[in-house]
Amino acid sequence: FARGRRILPAIRRRQGTRQPLPLSGMQEEGFGVFDSAEWLQAQTPSAGAKCSARGLAKLAAVMANGGSAHGHQLLTESGCAALHAEPIERKMTIMDNRFTQAGLALFDDADGAKGPLEAGMNCGRDGFYGWMGLGGSVFQWHPRKRIGFAYVPTALNPIDLFNERGKSYQKAVVQCLDTMS
């Protein structure tokens, strides 16, 4: 209930500014639209990705380690540095977010002071780069701590707007690493 109280004011402010749905059929199909032939042909990587947590975690490990892992160089160090460079702050729908020049979200605990939505999104993910998906999925990495992390739930939870399930596992991984060092 506390989470709902955090986001209700922002949702109420948006209700007067209804935007058309970006793809025809979304109203009728709901989440099933992500499996439609049209959506799959669009190859929209930020929505409806078909991947496993293991595959995403391997890629996140590469990103967290300067572009290479297990003796395989997938991205040059300069390419990796450019990918993470020049974060800027922009409003994305109902809250402020920080993105690099390559479109990576950068999470900063300090952004939590801006409001309850920013706190829900950022607090507990300080220093991580990457993305989250509708329903609870998390694909992020932490270059300073050299952590690659992915969580892909089997049960879609559309009301988990801040991906709290994945965040709890993410925090546990960071705590384990901090305990070991």
Where on the chain are the PLM-derived regions?
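Active-site Gly/Thr loop motif
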Residues: 1-47, 51-53, 85-144, 180
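Short, gly/Ser/Thr-rich active-site loops of penicillin-recognizing serine hydrolases
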Residues: 65-68, 78-79, 84-92, 159-181
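Short Gly/Pro-enriched loop/turn and capping motifs at secondary-structure junctions
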Residues: 109-110, 155-158
